[in-house]
């Protein structure tokens, strides 16, 4: 099936040329291209058109789980008839295993898995292995982390066909081999039940049941059933049932792995003893021996991922399988906000290695733990045959990799221009800022102020409040949901000024903001680099009166570069508007959607743009960005699941945990009422 792009808008401004250039580059096999698109120019809409033109499976890689959810919503609206999938970390909470030698502290792994995201991850891998070409997977950096062998996953796919001879008990054994669990009492995701000649399977990657009816040893009917109402939704002549887990293995592989682990354990224990590390040798022997007993008896153990090399049949030092292995050879990778995403991909391996070094050196884990890891950057590059880097401020790496193939997109469909930038002395900067704020308040516009430190942000906020200016601050110490609430209240007019540090850069979409003030703009460093200044200035680009004031006592190279580039873009935008008779239009957006979703309109760059994305720190389902894209039945199931968890916690007398689930339940019910009444 081919990609079918659904949108009431047509490419305008720089978009047609950008689409043509990028499409031509991909079809000609160009390994790397860069889309340099300013804020609000409709970069997502451009990429959607490129995907439609090339008709290849595509991975959209984002550096942030919340932005990934936003992009997922956008591409879902562009391609409603194609497979648009979502693949991010499925942990609501994750505390990795670690050892701190300085204090002799061992920290056990602790986690909570989000069932809804686990389902979406399985749906993504199932779509990729189905053989269809029209697949878009929106992913965070989780796509470079180790997972099961795609061959093992595919070998456990169960193909059934109406009229085919198949012994029912053989079918049930195959379901168990695919890690489905029989439960005739309560059917949950990943379970199946048997009633006579009818087998109901709650698919691990779907919201619906698959009902397989037998007549003797022949498959009589294959139906998709609504799990709540029992209504038949669809009938199939043939169907592929994908496994219930991404990590597949066989009994033979398991026994072989245990034998190899025990052989290597003997060698590693002997090595510790030779070095005189008797305590470490004893610890390693006891821990691994216990793990092997658990695997023999139960089929799993805590930390089994540290033995993944043995189960996969990989040699020491070889890279793990990851999501990229599930794609065909000719797929495309689009790296969004590449100036942030690429360094993140590069850093993942080093951080993982540093943590595990202590675990291995002190006998908590075998050396095989090193092979349960994210990809090294060089390994990622080998798998990424064709890449489009997308950023308003691409880094030197992307520019070098693209070898000069830079596709520029600076014209906004709204006709809005890049903001005017002024440089003012830092002497009396707060008094000057106060005057500017008062002017914006009179016009009912908003102001963003960026400082260098959290303390400066808090102190400036206190000063402004003492002077009767309604303001608040956001930085990394402010809770995720509270940050979202504060920024939405800024749009609603509860505050006139928002003060922040580094959260006012990529992706913050506040059309009411007409002034961005950058304090200490001449303090060269990460927060005042050319790219940071350009991204920060871009927050004023969605208002027709957009203006940026840099307070500084000298002109740094970063400031000069930012100002020169902004002026160049303004001239090009002005010339285009004059040539085509375009009058800039102020963006109007529904305030309650400021930070909670997206649609094709804004992606096309017509009236809106990308939204704030802030990594969720709460471990509640209500805080997860994917909730906003749930259908009504999905939301009902999530509410019911949360209610069960609350009741189970109460039965165990875990009242604090029960209260947390109760609060989450109330939030989900409120969201349900807001959306569907």
What residue spans do the PLM features occupy?
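Conserved pre-motif I regulatory segment
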Residues: 1-36
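Pre-Walker A (Motif I) flank of P-loop NTPase domains
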Residues: 27-34, 56-57, 133-135, 445-446
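Walker A/P-loop
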Residues: 28-50
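Conserved strand-helix element at the start of the C-terminal RecA-like helicase core
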Residues: 57-69, 86, 277-280, 440-462
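Short amphipathic alpha-helical segment within the helicase RecA-like ATPase core
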Residues: 69-77, 97-99, 459-463
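Conserved RecA-like helicase motor-core motifs
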Residues: 80-89, 303, 446-448, 460-482
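N-terminal cationic and glycine-rich segments that engage phosphates or anionic surfaces
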Residues: 87-432, 436-442, 461, 495, ...
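Conserved helicase ATPase core of P-loop NTP-dependent helicases/translocases
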Residues: 478-500
